[in-house]
Swiss-Prot record:
Domain of life per record: Archaea
One CC-aspect GO term: cytosol
Function according to Swiss-Prot or TrEMBL: May play a key role in the regulation of the intracellular concentration of adenosylhomocysteine.
Compartments, record wording: Cytoplasm
GO MF assignments: adenosylhomocysteinase activity
An annotated GO BP: one-carbon metabolic process
EC number: 3.13.2.1
Protein name: Adenosylhomocysteinase
Length: 437
């Protein structure tokens, strides 16, 4: 097995330039790296990181390596790898198995590659790595496991789990999968749900996805957003962020489709229209899914859309839009721009799908800005340190609040922002039950 496999090693110089730019905008992670270089809290650990291979991820991986870890980096999406960054990291001694445009077989070969290094900590974005490990642990043999074994060789499940101390998960989608695994009684090692940290979801999910989703839509289409009717499926933190930016870009109508009555009510109070997708399909110009669920936009919805409707997905997996159904019924299909395909329906209408229905911000753009990933990946680095220092029972955990607040404090410090502190009198007041009216 080679130490790394990337698309083109000659891209490494350009990748180093990308990493340099990211590091200029990720001061919190660099401060953590400086401490890691001295303390080596990850010494002796092998971290298998299944993440989008971007310049920001590269800064995280360098930080983990500075902490003493041996790092194996594989992609969490077949289309999101930045090949120049992958090449640069491979030259630095990171074990990288990633390139843009992987087939399903190659994608799961990458997971097998990571497992061949016998990881002690897993780091996931969408839970594909963790789910695969659990399939092996529970004796499941499907086609994806066959692909894994092509590069991992024969795996001793008991030995694999005896070495894994714990894992982390970056996304809402991944946390949902892992909590389902826990609920079924099949979770085999502890997981820290990084996505549940305030300094992750309040910033990454809302501001990061809000900006990068529209970056992807505009790069793919070069359309003017002002004056358009925008339909957003899902009003979690990702949907909120997309809606905020749609309004800021001048969308004529921002329509939210939501199944949760509390979130739907919140969307109404935030000033957006709320309606079912059946109705929204008839009036929308641009549709963006952010639900984490299957077929938020069904084939029936697509047939109701205007001629020229644009479809994009901001959720982790390419299941939120019924792409398979669209492929099946379309009478014609052609690529008219990079990452933009035109489908002609039997009724003569045309719809435009961005990035095969995969993550629009990473397929058609570069993902989240470095400044916001500084927070998310600071959480990832500190979660890895927490796992290395603490033996946890099998469960899905939130990162301790003191770590979450420390990330926020460091970010404010690097931004040159000071905050107020409680006086001693105020501390006594809020800790007393006797004082009142």
């Amino acid at each position: 097995m080679p130490e790394s496999r990337v698309k083109d090693s000659s891209l490494a110089d350009r990748g180093r330039e990308q990493l340099y730019w990211a590091e200029l905008n990720m001061p919190v992670l660099l401060e953590i790296r400086r401490r890691f270089e001295k303390e080596k809290p990850l010494s002796g650990h092998v971290i298998a990181a299944c993440l989008h291979v971007t310049k920001e991820t590269g800064v995280l991986v360098r930080t983990l390596a500075a902490g003493g870890a041996e790092v194996v980096l594989i992609p969490s999406n077949p289309l999101s790898t930045q090949d120049d960054v992958a090449a640069a990291l491979a030259q630095e001694g990171i074990h990288v198995y990633a390139w843009r445009g992987m087939s399903e077989r190659e994608y799961y070969n990458a997971i097998g590659f990571a497992l061949s290094f016998n990881p002690t900590i897993t780091m996931d974005d969408g839970a594909d790595l963790t789910a695969t490990i659990h399939k092996i642990g529970h004796g499941v043999r499907d086609q994806t496991i066959e692909y894994v074994l092509e590069t991992a060789g024969s795996l001793d499940a008991a030995g694999l789990f005896s070495r894994i101390r714990g894992g982390t998960e970056e996304t809402t989608t991944g946390v949902i999968r892992l909590k389902a695994l826990k609920k079924s009684g099949k979770l085999l090692y502890p997981i820290i749900a990084v996505n549940e940290s305030y300094t992750k979801y309040l910033f990454d999910n809302r501001y990061g996805t809000g900006q990068s989703t529209w970056d992807g839509v505009m790069r793919a289409t070069n359309l003017l957003i002002a004056g358009k009717n925008v339909v957003i499926a899902g009003y979690g933190w990702v949907g909120r962020g997309i809606a905020i930016r749609a309004r800021g870009l001048g969308a004529r109508r921002v329509i939210v489709v939501e199944v949760d009555p509390i979130r739907a009510l919140e969307a109404v109070f935030d000033g957006y229209e709320v309606m079912p997708m059946d109705k929204a399909a008839e009036v929308g110009d641009i549709f963006i899914t952010a639900t984490g669920n299957i077929r938020a936009i069904s084939l029936g919805h697509i047939f109701k859309m205007k001629d020229g409707a644009v479809l994009a997905n901001a959720g982790h997996f390419n299941v939120e839009i019924d792409v398979a159904g669209l492929e099946r019924v379309a009478v014609a299909k052609r690529r008219i721009r990079p990452y933009l395909e035109e489908y002609t329906l039997p009724n003569g209408k045309r719809v435009y799908l961005i990035g095969e229905g995969r993550l629009v911000n990473l397929v058609a753009a570069e993902g989240h800005p470095s400044e916001v990933m500084d927070l998310s990946f600071a959480n990832q680095a500190l979660a890895a340190e927490f796992l290395a220092k603490n033996k946890l029972s099998v469960d899905v955990y939130k990162l301790p609040d003191e770590i979450d607040r420390e990330v926020a404090r460091l970010k404010l410090k690097t931004m040159g922002i000071e905050i107020e502190e409680l006086t001693e009198e105020q501390r006594r007041y809020i800790s007393s039950w006797e004082l009142g009216t």
